[in-house]
């Protein structure tokens, strides 16, 4: 497979893609399975309180109540069309890189960590502008993503923006590969597989994220696959963010509900819908909630609109 450096604004999901081959996917699952021999993984300590803000599409923010560690999953904010899909006006703080950085600075976080699932424009489109804007405000900004993508695919772009990759990308610029871990200022990230494709050929990933006593599964863009059950057995996530938009690119509401059931999450939030004519509109959320009621009625489903913040308290779970 040929790997190429990429421009964050160049690729969109409706352009031709380089597919992550089945062979490589199976190898990735083998890595995940091998990680089960490493012993138990326990969630980070904390109160179980989490603020969640959905920015539209597949992009969302996690933070404890004091905003000490802010985690962004993917980086498509001021160019995000998710508000339009709901007929909503985008708030001023999400309208530009500078405005967003100002709003984050006002919250006085110890750090902001940007976790990248893959390089399609509706996830990666604002990445370098975001990192640069936060850095220019003297905010401690870090990032984590698939190791080869971070070290090879976008390495030159960091230099173009005047950024030091080794100081921004966790694990001294290496990122993480499947089954790998990165930890920083109270947040922990573990890479898990996603069945999707990328513009550059580097494999897409999802994340297990531990923050303030809550374990989050972020599916990224993916189809349903059998080893989601292994993710559940291995990591027992409390909260799952799953793509539900269907259409040409990802699983839809029914398969997303099955995914939540397989990973064993006690709470679920649907994302990646209503941001493009190619995916389902706002109705996808209700379709997902109905499917969850059939498949796993005890799972608490939170439906959100772009820009909204939900405050969740998730009781501690006993894990191996």
Predicted regions located by residue number:
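Active-site neighborhood of phospho(di)ester-bond hydrolases with catalytic His/Asp-centered motifs
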Residues: 73-74, 111-119, 144-147, 217-220, ...
